[in-house]
C-alpha cells in the first residue's frame, strides 16, 4: 500500500455585479498532470510576478468569466484582455497538452481552454454537463469540490449573441487552500522537541539503574518504550490542562475588571414611586377634560366585564347581535345593514315592491303603444320624411311617362319636343326655371362628356382615314410625276429618232402604238388594285365604328333597365313606409281626441262648480284648437307644394331623358343611312373610276399621236388635226360630266 499524497486545493471568491455570490473550491489532479496543476495554482496565488509577453501580473484576481453557455460550460481566465483573446501561462506563452487520461464524463470538471493542439495558456472552463466530444482535445486537471450552486448561478446569467453575460461575473479573490493536517503535524513536531528534552533527563537516571540489572534483555527495551509512550501521554495531558488554566486566568481578570466598573458606577437614591407621571398632550383638545370619577367608573366596569367573560368566550352583547332575515339567513358582522336579500319569488313582490315606480311604468307603456313595428329595416339614403314623400310622388309618374315616351319615340321628332319644352318653360316661375337649369346643366355635362368621347373616337378614326388617303394621294402623285417625266424623255428621244428616221415604214408606227396601249393597260390595272385596297380599309374602319356604337347602345340600354328596376323598388318601399306612418298618425290623432273628450267631461263637471274659470279655459281651448288647425293647414300646404315641385321636376327630367333617347336614336338612324350611302358609293365608285381611268388613258394616247403626227405632217394637216383634237376634248369633257353625275361619292373617296 503506497502512501496517499493529498492533492492541492484552490478557491475563487466570485461576485456578480459587485455583489458576493459565494466561494468555489477546486481540487487539482496533480498526480495525473502536475505541470498544468502547478500553472493553475501559481495563477491562483499570483506568486510568479508579471508575464513575459503580456507584461501583466500572472494572477486570476479581478478576472472576468467572459463566456457562459447554458447546459455546456462556464469559461474564464483571460487576465490580460478579458474577452477570450488574451492570457499567458507561467512558463511564458503557451505550453503543450500534458495528458488526456481524465475524460469529460461528468459535470463540474476543471479543464484547460486552448486554440488548438499544444496551445494551453491561462484560460480554463468548468463543465456543467458531461461533454464527451471534448475528449482528446482539452486537458482535464481538476474538479469542483464545493460551490456548485455558484457555478449554476453563473450558468443561468443572461447573455448576448456572443455568449457574453450581461452581468459582470468577476473573481474577487483567489488562492490556495492549505489543509489542517499539515498544521497539526507542525505543532506536534514542536511539542515532541520540547517533550524529548524533559524526558531525556528522567530516562538517563532510570537507564543507569536498570543497565546494571538487565542490559541484555529485550523485554526491558519494550517496557521502556511503553513507559515513554505513557509519559508522553501524561505530558500532553498536562499541557492541555495548563492551556485551559491559562485561558481561564485570562478570562478571570477581564470579569474582575467588569465587576470593578459596576461597583464604581454611582447608584440612584430616588424611589420609583416618587417619579411623577408623564403629562398628556392636550394642546389641541377642545372638549372639557373628563372628570376623575368617570374614569374610575369606566375602569371598574371593564374589570367586571373581564371577570365575567373569560378570554375565550364571546361577550353576550356580541352574541345578541346575530340577526335573522325573514328567509332564515343569519346576518353577521358589525355596523348597519346596507343590503337587502332579494325575494326568491319575484311574482309576489312585483306590485308591492317593483323595480320601477308606477309613474315611470305608465310612461314606458305609453311610449311602447305609440311605436308601430315596421317590418322593413332602415335603408341607406332615407334622410328625412320629405325625401320619402318626394320619391313616393316621383316613382309612379316616372314609370308612366317612361312608357309613354317609349311609345312616342318613333312618332315624335326632336324639333317638336323642343317646341313643347319651350312652351312649358314659358308657363313656369323663375324658381322652377333655376331648378330646371341646374338639372339640365348636369344632364348637358353628362351628354357633353359622352359626345366628347364619341367625337374623340370618331375623330381618331377620321384622322386615320385621312392619313391613309393622304398617303395614297402622295403615292399617286409620285407615280404620275414619274410617268410625266418618262413621257417627256420619251418624247425628246422620239423627236430625235423621227428626225433621223423619217423614212421608216408605217409598220413600225403600228408596233409602237400597240406597245403603248399595252403599257397603258398595265398602268390602269395597277391603279384599280390600289383603289380596291383603299376601299377595303375604309370598309374595315366603318365596321369597327359600327361595332363600337352597338356596344355603347347595349350598355346604355342595360343601365336604363337597371335604373327602372331601382326606381320601382324605391317607390314600393316609400309607399309601404308612408302607409305605416299614416296609420300611426291616425292612431295618435284618435288617442289625442279621446284624451280631449275625457278632459272636457271633467272640465264640464268643474265648470258647474266654478263658472268663472270655465270661460277662461274655453278661450284657451279655442286658441289651442285654432293654432293646431292652422299648423295642420300649413303642413298640408307645404306637402302639396313639395309634391307639385317633385312632380314637375320629375316631368322635366323624364322629358329631357326622352329627348336624349330620341336624339340618340335619330343619330343612330342618320349614321346608318350615311353608312348605307357610303356603301352604295363604294359599290358604284370602282366601276366609274375604271371607266374614267380608261377614258383618260385613251385621251392621252390620242393627244400624243396628234403631237407626233403634227411634227411630221404639213401645217395644213396640223390645222385639221387640231380641229379634230378639239372635238375629241369636247367629247371627253361630256363623258366626264356624265361620270360625275352617275357617281357622287368618288370625290369623297379620293379626298378620304
UniProtKB/Swiss-Prot annotation:
What is catalyzed by this enzyme?
Answer: [protein]-peptidylproline (omega=180) = [protein]-peptidylproline (omega=0)
Protein origin, superkingdom: Eukaryota
Q: Name one GO molecular function term.
A: cyclosporin A binding
The way its activity is modulated is described as:
Inhibited by cyclosporin A (CsA).
Predominant location of this chain?
nucleus
Q: What is its EC number?
A: 5.2.1.8
Might you report a single GO cellular component term?
cytoplasm
Which residues does the UniProt record annotate as the domain PPIase cyclophilin-type? 11-176
Q: Which residues carry this modification: Phosphothreonine?
A: 356, 746
State the compartments where it is located. Nucleus matrix; Nucleus speckle
Alphabetically sorted, this entry's keywords are: Isomerase, Isopeptide bond, Nucleus, Phosphoprotein, Rotamase, Ubl conjugation
Tell what the record comments on domains: The RS domain is required for the interaction with the phosphorylated C-terminal domain of RNA polymerase II.
Protein name stated in the entry: Peptidyl-prolyl cis-trans isomerase G
- Whose protein is this, by species? Rattus norvegicus (Rat)
Organism placement in taxonomy: Eukaryota, Metazoa, Chordata, Craniata, Vertebrata
Which gene is annotated as encoding this protein in its UniProt record?
Answer: Ppig
